[in-house]
Amino acid sequence: VTETLRALAARYDRRSALTLALLLVTYALVAVMWRRYIDLSQRDVLLVGIWIFMTALMCWDIRPQRDLIRAVVGLGGGLVIEAWGTVTEIWWYFTAERPPIWILPAWPVASIAIDRLARAVDLVLPQGDHRALWWLMLPPFTIGMTWWVWPSVNHPMTMAAVVAMGVVLVWPGATREDVRLMLAGSGLGIFLEYWGTSRHCWTYYTLETPPIAAVFAHGFAAVAFQRVAALCDKAVTAWRSALPQRN
């Protein structure tokens, strides 16, 4: 346990301090831009805890190229997911926007945070590819999520979402990586979804706080984002290799 904690702590460095400063500036800008939605008279311990934890993750083991790619993929994927969910009314926000612009910055932050958390999970996860866990988590989720969104299956965006989940399953990926992303994303999803639904920031059509499908969807989305990010990683590496070498 001590060695694991030391390994985790060793991945904080000078870049962590710079990242923390940039994050604090970003948080301040977001708070100013959407201050009409902020009520400082209420103390939300859970929200503060979530943001402290995610900020700690954002400052850990910084890899600029990897992080930038996952931020862009997370933003794009988040926009598609939010548009799908709000247009089909699988969920809706208290502002009735479809989707609200203010929720979008949370997606790249969550994408990087889950990637960090998954790498931390890798330090404590037993050796092996955990293929059995993969089969116990990803295919059942796909079936369960399809059943959960079935009331809106006639909508083209829901049809596309179901097809996309199938593509993620058959798209070759590292089994161990999928498992740790699913664990990390779903673990963080528990707190994010409970906060959002219990505070009525967003509401699902089932009125659950929160629906189990929504919790595990964070993990599956992380796996899907990684599929796309891995392609981007390869493209950037190939592009750099093709550049003229400096003497």
PLM feature spans:
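Aromatic-rich, lipid-facing transmembrane alpha helices and their immediate juxtamembrane interface loops
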Residues: 1-247
